[in-house]
Amino acid sequence: DLLGNGDLEAIAKREGKFPWLVDAAGEWTVRNDVYFQEARVAENGKGSPLSATSNGKSIGPELGFGHVLGNFHDEQVLLIKTAMGNRALGFDFRPPSSGRTDPDNKFEALEYKLMIDGVRKTLANIDKIVPGYNGAGYDVAGFVWFQGHKDSFSEDLIQGYEKNLVNLINDVRKEFEVPQMPCVVATVGFGGNNMSEKFVRILDAQMAVGNAVKHPEYAGTVASVDTRKFWREVDQSPRNQDYHYNRNAETYMLIGDAMGRSMVELLGGKADPLSVPVMSARATKQPVENSEDEKIAQQKSL
């Protein structure tokens, strides 16, 4: 959130954390080398250069993640986010390789289909989304997964989480024909070190896929990020909503940063230290200015 205790205004502008988010005039910085598109929300118009307001009034881990990846890559980066709350991996996002438990239920596996369709639609319109693209070509360079709350309410889904996550990774790789696509899984972190047992079981499944002993087939291509240390309590946060990490901006920034560092390592690099961000030259270039009509349409899509 951008307002309240633990919000981005407080931690960045008043407390001075994540100083690269704020420019010398006290305004939110804009990364013109990293573009953001919410595939489930945005229409076919232009994407948004990454900033604190790319996703409207709230931020997700994409902000921290995008800064790390933008620092690493010399090329333009496009972040495609497809998110829908209160959804389970074992039901809503159920991957094809997991089969169907209820073929007559139109909602089972629907979110998986919408996710894949959303990414494909975004890539099909990339020339409209990324200014100056001009047919440059692109690589589907990685996949990030951050989810787990809904599955914890079903014993069957808890038990099946690891297998469903393995199938998800494999199926996404098949969809985009990238057999060794780097994948980063961020665990649930609800409650931090005081996490309830049901969430611990989900976390264990999420950590397992990044463990080369348990899944040697993923060695060097899949990493897991334990997010428990990024949890902030209610008195440090804008709201009492554990399922949204109490809407604490620092939590989301740290999770995104950690996911970004893990992705960079999978790509064979090393991320800049958190305290010393270095923006590429491309980041400081002026973006292509949208018309007033385009700006209005873009705001309506957020």
Task: Give names to the regions the model predicted.
Residues 1-302:
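Cell-envelope and extracellular/periplasmic
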